[in-house]
Amino acid sequence: MAALSRALGPLRTPAPPLWIGLFLVATGSQQSLAQPLPGNTTEATPRSLRASGSLCGPHAKAPYLCEATHEPAAARIRAQVPDTRWSRVGGQRFYSRVLSPLHRGPSGHTEASAQRSHMGKLKEPQPQDHKPGLGAS
């Protein structure tokens, strides 16, 4: 236990060792982690990022450790990319379906039916109003 806490000591900044220690004790995986842990962390103590990377590689028992250290950038990118892609794809699909039949209309019957439904129910301006907000956010 002393070796485990000493090995987790340098990783104080990226991930709280007390929380990880409690997590390991609660899961009972402290024994399986105690052997690879001290070697990895004492070798890579100055580069705590790399140490946590090697930590979450071999055993999937400590996913939180690598999440806490080198996940933020990837998580930020992963959180942004689907968001922008969805809004861009959804916004453009919305735009091409709602506006282009009304404005140019590649095929005549779609333009006529779209205009008729637009004049009849006045439901089309609502998606049009939603579209800029969708694309912007």
From Swiss-Prot:
**Carbohydrate-modified residues:** N40
Q: Which positions make up the signal peptide? A: 1-34
Q: Name one GO cellular component term.
A: extracellular region
Q: Which ranges are annotated Basic and acidic residues under compositional bias? A: 121-137
- Main subcellular location of this protein, as a coarse class: secreted
Q: Does the keyword rRNA-binding apply?
A: no
Regions of biased composition (Polar residues) lie at: 33-45
Chain intervals for the UniProt region annotation (Disordered): 33-54, 98-137
Query: In which compartments does the protein localize?
Result: Secreted
Q: Which UniProt keywords apply?
A: Glycoprotein, Secreted, Signal
Name of the protein this chain belongs to? Putative uncharacterized protein UNQ9165/PRO28630
Q: What's the source species' lineage?
A: Eukaryota, Metazoa, Chordata, Craniata, Vertebrata
